[in-house]
Amino acid sequence: PVASPRRTRLLASGWRFHLGHASDVERDFGFGRNQRTYAKAGAATADAAYAAFDDSAWDRVQVPHDWAVALPFAQPAKPAPKETADAVAAHGFKAIGRDFPQHSVGWYRLPLAIEPGDRERRTWLEFDGVFRDCLVLINGYVVGRNESGYAPFNVDISDFLDYEGGPNQLCLRVDASLGEGWFYEGAGIYRHVKQVTAHAVHVPPWGTFVRAETGAAGAQVSISTEVANDGLAEARVTI
């Protein structure tokens, strides 16, 4: 059999984690201080976003990971009136949210393994779920963001990688200050993360859709497939 041109790696181990801060820039590793967070001309995001940053004092964690579950129990500064639903109770009385900025932002770091031959290919990250607002950085550059605690998302990182043997640093800033549900929701990378490398001509994430139509005489299955060409040359392919 022919080997698949696509490689998928589960990013479960090797992560480092540290709490940031939702309102104190010093305790949030300088994030956003210089107002050039999204500058294209050069990376200027946060100290923790760069490969040279020393994260040896950070916690070692496995992903999936939820930092809220380890937080102490607490009441907010202004408890809910008795006649209204107690959202704090529904969320497990965890010390997270707008009343607890010191517990509501988390930073994750992970070095990525990149092969020199991947320069002509495409590499992206697949996140099955991060709670909640997630900023994805590669080598100090903001490459994507997602503002949902439950929707999966993908980020193409190909154009920000070092293919000459240098370090490639993945960094995530996750802000769980705002919730979505009436129930305990947690905080952090609570579902799987995958690193995918594929040929420049490939079926993108969610590029295959299967539908079935049934009737008295039987069923008809239809499959539609999207093909993306992220290379610089025209390509002829067969599906």
Language-model regions, residue ranges each:
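Accessory beta-strand-rich segments of carbohydrate-active enzymes
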Residues: R7, H18-A22, A44, A74, ...
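A short, compositionally biased
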Residues: L10-S13, V130, E234-R236
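Beta-strand-rich binding/interaction modules
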Residues: V136-I138, A219-I239
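Short, solvent-exposed loop/linker segments at the N-terminal edge
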Residues: R211-A219
